[in-house]
Amino acid sequence: IGKESLENATSSYNLEFRDSEYKFPTHCPECGTTLVREEGEAAWRCPNESGCAPQIKGKMEHFVSRKAMNIEGLGSETIDLLYSQGLLKNIADIYSLTQEDIARQERLGEKSAHNMLASIEVSKQVPWARVLFALGIRMVGETTARKIARRFPSIDQLQWATMEQLTSIEDVG
């Protein structure tokens, strides 16, 4: 953009019609829950993790992603479709899908259902660190998940971890 074009563009904007103050949204536009901001963080977010459709679907998308459980054939469009049909309400529902559930959906079929179920079956063998990452726990990325998994090699050991044990892990707490 040339200097003249920029000057013309900015001089034609009438500031008189601009609202004097931006009104930041206070509620989630999807579910209506009051937005919150954690101390020390800049972002406001919806805390309704189990009732806000975009959050539920986003968690599922993260869970099935390549670096997490690597479930092929279950991308955002398919998650949207299965969520809208009531077949996916949470991550656990992925492991309850049947050949019939998938095959009867528009744009899917027997072959898609077979491939998706095979990929879901393979996902049951991913390393514990990837499962931990796939859960989408705030502030637990791939590296932190690996560190936690090294310290607590099973979910049984992790569930009994004390706060002191967890915070003694580098990058945790």
Pin down the residues of each PLM region.
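Accessory alpha-helical DNA-binding modules that contact the DNA backbone or grooves
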Residues: 4-172
